Amino acid sequence: VDAPADMVLKAPAGAKMTKAPVDFSHKGHAALDCTKCHHKWDGKAEVKKCSAEGCHVBTSKKGKKSTPKFYSAFHSKSDISCVGCHKALKKATGPTKCGDCHPKKK
């Protein structure tokens, strides 16, 4: 799979970012199966962003729990979110606190 080595994760249009964007390393996560994060990917089609239609399109933090929220794609307790996965790993090297991923704005 051809993925960018490094990228910056930002909220999609319509969502308010309250913290700094996240520098993300695909290379640093290469040992994981791509579907760990891209859980709707079939292994063949182009990989879509989390905010793509059919995924986490709701940019609000409130509302029906059945609607996948963009925020929850990264912050839920589920092991298919960034925070949930890192907490489940319980590794000292993995970020689990807000400031670990979201550096203070300068």
From Swiss-Prot:
Gene3D superfamilies: Cytochrome C3. One of its GO terms (biological process) is anaerobic respiration. Keywords: Electron transport, Heme, Iron, Metal-binding, Sulfate respiration, Transport. Heme c 4 binds at residues 75, 98, 101-102. Binds 4 heme c groups per subunit. Heme c 1 binds at residues 26, 34, 37-38. Heme c 2 binds at residues 39, 50, 55-56. PROSITE patterns: MULTIHEME_CYTC. Heme c 3 binds at residues 29, 82, 85-86. The second heme binding site has an unusual CXXXXCH motif. This is Cytochrome c3. It comes from Maridesulfovibrio salexigens.
